[in-house]
Amino acid sequence: LDSIIHLTDEQFYQLCMANKDVNLELNAEGELIIVPPVGGESGRNEADLIIKVGNWNYQTKLGIVFSSSTIFRLPNGAKRSPDVAWIKLEKWQALTEEEREKFPPLTPDFVIEL
């Protein structure tokens, strides 16, 4: 079946901003995905991993760490938010201010998905 609605990057961004209490993603085919909340154990494990990657990054100062609240615009058109993401500092610095403020148009260098 064909999708009824095709969202531009800006329309998807506005949809997410208007519905901040709902975690949304788009797959490469443009299908909207509602991401359910996680339970206590999964949330605790996710937080543990963010702390560990964050501590490593704090020591090395090689990049930027992101939580599952950050959506990345991937080259295949998908808009995804991994549980933990890390990006090399030079990739982050190459983005414009607007790209940093909205959904960064890049693939993280490292992700963890629980």
What are these regions (language model features)?
Residues 1-114:
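Gly/Pro/Ser/Thr-rich low-complexity, intrinsically disordered segments predominantly at protein N-termini
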